C-alpha cells in the first residue's frame, strides 16, 4: 500500500510540474488555447483525480 501511495504522490508532483509549465505556454501562444483546450482540461482532470487518490490512500495508510 505504501508503494501505491508513493507512486500516486510522484504522479501528482509530475503532473503539477507539467501543468505548471504547459498552461502558461498554451495561454501565451497565439492560437494555443483554441487548439489545446482539450489537453489542458484533460491534464486538469487528471490532477484533480490524483489529488483525491492521494487523499484516499493517505487515509488508508495512516
Curated annotation (Swiss-Prot):
What GO CC annotations are associated with the protein? chloroplast thylakoid membrane; photosystem II reaction center
Which Pfam families did the record assign? Ycf9 (PF01737)
GO BP annotations of the record are: photosynthesis; photosystem II stabilization
Question: Where do the TM regions start and end?
Answer: 8-28, 41-61
Localization terms from the record: Plastid, Chloroplast thylakoid membrane
InterPro entries the record matches: PSII_PsbZ (IPR002644), PSII_PsbZ_sf (IPR036512)
Q: How does it sit in the membrane?
A: Multi-pass membrane protein
Keyword Chloroplast (UniProt): yes
Q: What is its main location?
A: plastid
Signal sequence bounds: none
Q: Which UniProt keywords apply?
A: Chloroplast, Membrane, Photosynthesis, Photosystem II, Plastid, Reaction center, Thylakoid, Transmembrane, Transmembrane helix
Q: Does the keyword Transmembrane apply?
A: yes
Describe the family membership recorded for this protein in Swiss-Prot or TrEMBL. Answer: Belongs to the PsbZ family.
Q: What does this protein do?
A: May control the interaction of photosystem II (PSII) cores with the light-harvesting antenna, regulates electron flow through the 2 photosystem reaction centers. PSII is a light-driven water plastoquinone oxidoreductase, using light energy to abstract electrons from H(2)O, generating a proton gradient subsequently used for ATP formation.
Summarize subunit and interaction data from the UniProt record for this chain.
Answer: PSII is composed of 1 copy each of membrane proteins PsbA, PsbB, PsbC, PsbD, PsbE, PsbF, PsbH, PsbI, PsbJ, PsbK, PsbL, PsbM, PsbT, PsbY, PsbZ, Psb30/Ycf12, at least 3 peripheral proteins of the oxygen-evolving complex and a large number of cofactors. It forms dimeric complexes.
Protein name as it appears in the record: Photosystem II reaction center protein Z
Which organism encodes this protein?
Answer: Eucalyptus globulus subsp. globulus
Lineage, top ranks: Eukaryota, Viridiplantae, Streptophyta, Embryophyta, Tracheophyta
**Originating gene:** psbZ
Amino acid at each position: 500500500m505504501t508503494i501505491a501511495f508513493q507512486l500516486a504522490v510522484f504522479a501528482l508532483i509530475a503532473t503539477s510540474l507539467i501543468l505548471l509549465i504547459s498552461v502558461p505556454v498554451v495561454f501565451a501562444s497565439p492560437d494555443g488555447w483554441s487548439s489545446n483546450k482539450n489537453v489542458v482540461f484533460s491534464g486538469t482532470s487528471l490532477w484533480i483525480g490524483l489529488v483525491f487518490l492521494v487523499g484516499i490512500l493517505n487515509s488508508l495508510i495512516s
